[in-house]
Amino acid sequence: AREVGTPVKLIWSRAEDMQHDIYRPGVSSKFRAAVAADGQVLAWDNVYHEKHEPAEAPVIPYAITAQHIHHTDSPTHLPFGPWRSVDHSQHGFFTEAFFDEVAEAAGEDPYQLRRKLLKDKPRHLKVLDLAAEKAGWGEPIAQGKGRGISLQESFGSLVAQVVDITVTEGKIGVDRVVCAIDAGFAVSPDGVAAQMESGIIYGL
């Protein structure tokens, strides 16, 4: 700017921008579960490794009697910055993806198994049921298409989403995302909607 005598605007690409900041904390998570012959989920075991220990992100709301959730520290020489709901966005994906595997092992519909294990949590159920209803859960889907459901609690808010996908020549395309949220009293409903919409776009 000094050489040319005029202001210069510099815009980094996404790839360049990510190289000029510290990283999100890396984390790995291992799961095991015990499922009885009648489909009852007996135990849930989760051991995860990361530099810091999140307080509530790995905790599941499901009524599984035997739960073991354990953290081990993973020292790193890299500086990290836990911004933007890091723990919840990571552990929410881990736990809900594994829960679907548990549902398959139990021979249960993933939505119905969630309902069964949330019978004493009416607030969770209301959000889950609303997302499933608006998405038309249970309606037939065509070959090559898929539908998944998830539920996560973060900072006092409950969010459930149903995603419809299409697989074409081995590539996954997202057709629709249905999102339901209970954030308590919303001072700015438009702000809540914008947060959900932008979060979905960011995730994609």
Question: What label would you give each PLM region?
Answer:
Residues 1-203:
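Cofactor-binding beta-sheet edge motifs in enzyme active sites
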